[in-house]
């Protein structure tokens, strides 16, 4: 019987998972190794909806070691995630330091950006599609445009 780890999402939902699944996250792995995971690990930046997706991914990657099987499963798994929360999954993968999931979500976003789905859309339309808040001021946008003028020609 494997050791269990309790994770608590930002919206208060608890998830009890196997330690080997939790250790797919380098951040959680460090907490376990440092003895900080004695009770519940609070994940203040990850909602229960997103955490469930991350846990599903980690469980599959712990249980299956066949590279080809995982590639096919990963592709199918990404198709089940709504594009409006894909960015949140990416941010959770980054926060939890799960490099393989971060790489997968980045590739999926890149593929979507190159596909007809987002072709010809403005930055504001793309942000709306992925439910990304624009937290830059007009001055910051102007500075970025000035520093990267070559990209806007």
From Swiss-Prot:
Pfam families: Skp1, Skp1_POZ. Residues 90-153 are annotated as: Interaction with the F-box domain of F-box proteins. One of its GO terms (biological process) is jasmonic acid mediated signaling pathway. Restricted to inflorescences, especially in the inflorescence meristem (IM). Pathway: Protein modification; protein ubiquitination. Keywords: Nucleus, Ubl conjugation pathway. Its main location: nucleus. GO terms for cellular component: nucleus; SCF ubiquitin ligase complex. It is found in: Nucleus. Belongs to the SKP1 family. Involved in ubiquitination and subsequent proteasomal degradation of target proteins. Together with CUL1, RBX1 and a F-box protein, it forms a SCF E3 ubiquitin ligase complex. The functional specificity of this complex depends on the type of F-box protein. In the SCF complex, it serves as an adapter that links the F-box protein to CUL1. Part of a SCF (SKP1-cullin-F-box) protein ligase complex. Interacts with PP2A13. This is SKP1-like protein 5. It comes from Arabidopsis thaliana (Mouse-ear cress). The lineage of its organism: Eukaryota, Viridiplantae, Streptophyta, Embryophyta, Tracheophyta.
């Amino acid at each position: 019987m494997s050791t269990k780890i309790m994770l608590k999402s930002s919206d208060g939902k608890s998830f009890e998972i196997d330690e080997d699944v939790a250790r797919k996250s380098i951040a959680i792995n460090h907490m376990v190794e440092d003895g900080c995971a004695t009770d519940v690990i609070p994940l203040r930046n990850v909602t229960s909806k997103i955490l469930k997706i991350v846990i599903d991914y980690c469980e599959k990657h712990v249980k299956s070691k066949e590279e080809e099987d995982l590639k096919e499963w990963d592709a199918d798994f990404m198709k089940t995630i709504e594009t409006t929360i894909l960015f949140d999954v990416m941010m959770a993968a980054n926060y939890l330091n799960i490099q393989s999931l971060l790489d997968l979500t980045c590739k999926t976003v890149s593929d979507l950006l190159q596909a007809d789905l987002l072709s010809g859309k403005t930055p504001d339309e793309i942000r709306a599609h992925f439910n990304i808040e624009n937290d830059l001021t007009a001055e910051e946008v102007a500075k970025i445009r000035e520093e990267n003028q070559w990209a806007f020609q």
